[in-house]
């Protein structure tokens, strides 16, 4: 979590091996089946929604439920040029979920989505995380989104982790109007120097 330009995306790209660090190292405890969702959907324009989602998977690994889970049923044969920005992003999310990863890296994946679709995607992400015990490194500039989705929230400023917060309430019981959430949000805002 952090303001624009603070190093959130760079951290994600370093963790995913898309960039190399100037110093230090990132270690993995074991091999992970990893998926990446970028800020901008990276779809192949010559493939349909369905073909983009199942690209690289064997026939037995394909699950039409992933398209349904992101609210794109009926658009399987559509091409990216026929989709809105939010629909393209949901296609990219479905592709990541179809891979059934153990580790998902997501760079502001819900930023282009309307409120209702964002809420639906947050619930689906939590379901996948609980069902698969998947670890998720989620980059956002939304404090509310971090509080709803995160178990640990790292506040980044100028490329450094400035503060680390643990959200103790079970995810299915989280309410942004509860005292714990209000207190955490206030602490995070104070750490980000918004006030």
Predicted regions and their residues:
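Hydrophobic anchor residue at the start of the ABC signature
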Residues: 93
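Conserved ABC ATPase "signature" region
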Residues: 33, 61-75, 126-127
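Conserved H-loop
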Residues: 133-139
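Conserved signature/switch motifs of ABC ATPase nucleotide-binding domains
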Residues: 78-81, 99
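Catalytic Walker B motif of ABC-type/P-loop ATPase nucleotide-binding domains
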Residues: 104-107
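Helix-to-loop junction immediately C-terminal to a conserved catalytic motif
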Residues: 16
């Amino acid at each position: 979590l952090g303001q624009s330009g603070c190093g959130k995306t760079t951290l994600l790209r370093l963790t995913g091996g898309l960039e190399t660090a100037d110093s230090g190292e990132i270690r993995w405890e074991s091999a992970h089946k990893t998926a990446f969702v970028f800020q901008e959907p990276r779809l192949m324009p010559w493939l349909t929604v369905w073909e983009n989602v199942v690209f690289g998977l064997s026939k037995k690994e394909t699950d039409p439920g992933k398209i349904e889970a992101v609210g794109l049923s009926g658009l399987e044969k559509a091409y990216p040029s026929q989709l809105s920005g939010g629909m393209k992003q949901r296609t990219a999310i479905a592709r990541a979920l179809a891979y059934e990863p153990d580790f998902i890296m997501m760079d502001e994946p819900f930023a282009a989505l309307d409120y209702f679709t964002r809420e639906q995607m947050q619930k689906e992400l939590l379901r996948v995380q609980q069902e698969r015990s998947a670890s998720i490194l989620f980059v956002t500039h939304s404090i509310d989104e971090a509080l709803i989705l995160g178990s640990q929230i790292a506040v980044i400023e100028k490329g450094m982790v400035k503060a680390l917060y643990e959200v103790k309430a079970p995810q299915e019981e989280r309410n942004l109007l509860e005292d714990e959430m209000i207190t955490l949000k206030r602490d995070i805002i104070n750490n980000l120097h918004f006030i």
